[in-house]
Amino acid sequence: MIYLILTSTLTLATTWIVPRNLLWPSSILNSILISVISLNLLNNHSTSLWHNLSLNFATDPTSTPLIILSSWLVPISLIASINTIQNHNHINQRTFISLVFTILTALILTFSSLELSLFYIAFETTLLPTLTLISRWGAQKERYQASIYFLFYTLIGSLPLLVSIIAIFSYENTIILPSIHLTNYITSLPITLTSIWWIFCFIAFIIKMPIYGFHLWLPKAHVEAPIAGSMILAAILLKLGGYGLLRTIPLFYTPSSLLLSPPATAFCIWGALITSIICLRQTDLKALIAYSSVGHMSIVASGIFSLSLWGINGALTLMIAHGLISSALFCLANLLYERNGTRTLSITRGFKMVTPLLTLWWTITCVANLGLPPTPNLIGELLILVAIIDWNTLSAPIITMATVFGAIYSLLILSSTNNSSFPQFLSNIQPTNTSEHTLITFHLIPLVFLILNPSAILIG
């Protein structure tokens, strides 16, 4: 674990040392090295609850897949950004790469931290680099408004989380997660106090995911962010909220959790349905993919709030699968944007006549996004569906409709980008190249691994 943290930190430092002509090759090679090192975490993934232990860091079956996902997608996001960022001067290029590696280091620290204070610091460290990526390298003037939305939503959610951590320390006299699980003093406190803690602790995570009702910052941030920002935001940063819920919900197995989880689950299911309907009315391709992320994260949150092992396993599986697929969708949307200069669905159409191989990638990613077998999305959604129906049979029609509308908008993306007639006023469309196909391929390789071995990310 320490080797992984040190490697990412040293890579961040070397970004400012290497010669200009070696900047991108060395950064990509270093990020690939981090990915290879992270794969070693799978060796003892299922042998014990905590492993790779040090004083403040450890991994377990919950954090290991998310660390590997973070490390895997950073080199892909760098390769996807080369065409855009190479037009800037070398200082801006070094700054951009440094911000990406800062986010990676903060993510590894967040997912491996045993202390709640270190978890909070690393959790909030991702804010500033992401904010800079959006405001500095966004495509349009609206990026400043998107940055303000992102900043204030995150800050509003962060303060209650900090108060919760301080309160936990004052009662438990420790903020180390294994120690809190052992003492379990919170369960003996009054239900009013634990209910307030429950709400304060989880509001930061449901904003970060986000679920419907706390999501207004996400479409703006996605639409205005550069491709690396969109890929990292969709694939990894949204999973911080889900990881926070998975980490802290065992601390609150109290009467308050049994009291507050049912309305939270119902709200998440309803939000998933509403968001799926909103997706059908979008005219911007990136906004549509962003709203689909809100819908998927609402389903993930409903699985976690169900407080069942099936729901938690389904949530973790869907988080990993959605991270890969949403990143691939944003990457494909960027490939079309680089060729026609717009994200409007009425213009971004008919590309199967110009780039037929991209149609294959669109088909695979959209099919995976709607959850057809044998994709991991189906496994996650089925596990959550079973957990929700077991929780309350009356919720079955709502979550089923949300899933059906999710399939409809996934097919809408595929149909509008490929099957319509190609606009006559567009000309000189560049053909795709090998590096672009390689990007999508490396998004799909982990999906094949999960199809062949889904138990790799399931918890006991």
Curated annotation (Swiss-Prot):
Write down the EC number: 7.1.1.2
Quote the subcellular location field of this record: Mitochondrion membrane
The GO annotation for biological process reads:
ATP synthesis coupled electron transport; electron transport coupled proton transport
**PANTHER family for the chain:** NADH-UBIQUINONE OXIDOREDUCTASE CHAIN 4
GO MF term (any one): NADH dehydrogenase (ubiquinone) activity
A Pfam match is Oxidored_q5_N
Q: Which UniProt keywords apply?
A: Electron transport, Membrane, Mitochondrion, NAD, Respiratory chain, Translocase, Transmembrane, Transmembrane helix, Transport, Ubiquinone
Task: Indicate the principal place this protein occupies in or around the cell.
Answer: mitochondrion
- The source organism is Patiria pectinifera
Root EC class: translocase
The protein's job, in short, is: Core subunit of the mitochondrial membrane respiratory chain NADH dehydrogenase (Complex I) that is believed to belong to the minimal assembly required for catalysis. Complex I functions in the transfer of electrons from NADH to the respiratory chain. The immediate electron acceptor for the enzyme is believed to be ubiquinone.
What InterPro entries does the annotation carry? NADH4_N, NADH_Q_OxRdtase_chainM/4, NADH_UbQ_OxRdtase, ND/Mrp_TM
User: Which superkingdom?
Assistant: Eukaryota
Does the record carry NAD as a key word?
A: yes
Similarity section: Belongs to the complex I subunit 4 family.
State whether keyword Transferase applies.
no
Protein name stated in the entry: NADH-ubiquinone oxidoreductase chain 4
Its placement in the membrane is given as: Multi-pass membrane protein
Membrane spanning residue stretches:
22-42, 65-85, 96-116, 118-138, 148-168, 185-207, 226-246, 258-278, 288-310, 315-337, 357-379, 394-414, 439-459
What does the record give as the reaction this protein catalyses? a ubiquinone + NADH + 5 H(+)(in) = a ubiquinol + NAD(+) + 4 H(+)(out)
Which GO cellular component terms, listed alphabetically, does the Swiss-Prot or TrEMBL entry include?
mitochondrial membrane
